[in-house]
Design a protein with these regions (language model features):
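Sec-dependent bacterial lipoprotein signal peptides
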Residues: 1-13
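OB-fold and OB-like single-stranded nucleic-acid-recognition modules
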Residues: 13-157
Length: 157
């Protein structure tokens, strides 16, 4: 019984934050940016670091440098970048919640591309309409230790 409990606890560690990934395609922002044959409406699961934020009249646009995702769907910020994308969210979005430098994971659908610039370099941004977004707490990447420990302790009051 004890072994079943321990295995259950270990298996629960690092659970994905976005559970509905049934229709997610294995496509990277670079694949879309480079003109691959990927249809609008394709569902993706991407994550990365916020580098720019813009509230427009009826939606917000968040520029994200993409990174591969860990098992818990957190962006692996120490890995090489997989390109950039623009996350589009409806209505007004609080800029403090999506501050530059924070990391996020999004499940969304591709909605075409937009030509823009990264500094002086022309760049084609994949547009993603967000369906489910998780913003990671500051410093999440430094807290990757196991959440289960075994030990004996004594509490004294």
């Amino acid at each position: 019984m004890f072994l079943v409990l321990v295995l259950g606890l270990i298996g629960g560690c690092g659970a994905p934050v976005i559970r509905d990934t049934t229709h997610v395609a294995a496509v990277r922002p670079l694949d879309v940016q480079q003109g691959g044959p990927i249809a609008d409406g394709t569902e993706v699961l991407w994550g990365g670091r916020i580098v720019a934020f813009d509230n427009r009249a009826d939606h917000a646009e968040i520029e994200v440098v993409a990174f591969p995702l860990a098992r818990d769907q957190s962006p692996l910020a120490e890995a090489p970048s997989e390109g950039r994308f623009l996350l589009v969210l409806p209505g007004y979005v609080e800029s403090v919640d999506y501050a530059v430098g924070r990391h996020l994971t999004v499940r969304g659908v591709l909605a075409g591309t937009r030509d823009g610039q990264v500094q002086e370099h022309a760049y084609r941004y994949p547009l993603v309409r967000g369906l489910d977004v998780h913003v990671w707490p500051w410093g999440y990447m430094f807290d990757r230790r196991p959440r289960v420990s075994i030990g004996i302790g004594v509490g004294i009051r």
